């Protein structure tokens, strides 16, 4: 009987408030530096949301052809730029692809193309329907990034979009890994968001979990007694997943293995109930990865920044990991960039991958007084040799997801 196919990460591309490219992103994350700042987008000044994680110095025209720019929103610009970075990192060119049907694309998105949509709606109401551009019909849609990435790359394998709230980013990677295990050679997967246009910001005002603080140093402090919610962010990450044997044959480095995943649903803003749902997802993901609780070397927490939600997450870790929950390092680097909705967890996956490679666990910015029974990494990066990382994500609408990464193509624990 042949060994089961395994999906490994061979390429990583990041566009985030910490910067563009994995190296720049990692340097800022490991230093514990915060990229949160007052929102400087035109039209947002009167809104009660004051702080966000904004991608600096992003020039889509320098990274994406004009043909695609006129058809797409900022969230798709992020996705296309991050995809090219990931393909370059994987050293995967068109010449390396045997058939266009051997490459698929899976993304997740929550906010869609709000910036493009707002611009066209303003034309509709200010000038009339004949001034609305034809690309409004596709640019706002959640599937736009998957479609444009596949068209640009000529990828004709299985493509899809995951709609699973903030947990969608992890679920997209799991969906991609499943496609690889079922026979697809390569899948480009990840998530990006651009939720900071005025229209998008107004749509978020109904979330009670959002922080209204106007102080970048106090607006997002998960797992503390002063936690007052989270701040939004833009950006995201894309990955190249390949079948392990095929990656090895072409000389690609297996940076990590997508070892296990599970998802549950516990209802919108039901944070006490999320404890059981998240614990079940953790236990199932570990079982599917062939890991025991004590095999987990680092946890990248969901870290919502809402007291009830943080408490539920800490208790879920205790339920799923037992005594090991008090010993395993836990971190939430997203406190320095904000929560990019569907893309928040894939940025955590990027950080986890880099943490395993650099043997450093980045700290949780803005946090000093941890009020939960966790070994939360704060202040400065912690030297470690993590081989197994657990990444967690929960959505405001009730989705819970857990993903297990193993360093390189290392065999699973016995």
UniProtKB/Swiss-Prot annotation:
Q: Which InterPro entries match?
A: Beta-ketoacyl_synthase, Ketoacyl_synth_C, Ketoacyl_synth_N, PKS_Beta-ketoAc_synthase_dom, Thiolase-like
Please tell me which top-level EC class this enzyme sits in: transferase
Q: Which SUPFAM superfamilies match?
A: Thiolase-like
Ranges of residues in domain Ketosynthase family 3 (KS3): 4-407
UniProt keywords (A-Z) are: Acyltransferase, Transferase
Q: Name one GO molecular function term.
A: 3-oxoacyl-[acyl-carrier-protein] synthase activity
* Superkingdom of the organism of origin: Bacteria
A Pfam family matched by this chain, by name?
A: Ketoacyl-synt_C
Task: Tell me its EC number(s), please.
Answer: 2.3.1.-
Q: Which GO terms describe its biological process?
A: fatty acid biosynthetic process
Q: What function does this protein fulfil?
A: Involved in developmentally regulated synthesis of a compound biosynthetically related to polyketide antibiotics which is essential for spore color in Streptomyces halstedii.
The extra comment attached to this record reads: This putative ketoacyl synthase lacks the active site cysteine.
Per the record, the similarity remark reads: Belongs to the thiolase-like superfamily. Beta-ketoacyl-ACP synthases family.
Q: What is the protein name stated in its UniProt record?
A: Putative polyketide beta-ketoacyl synthase 2
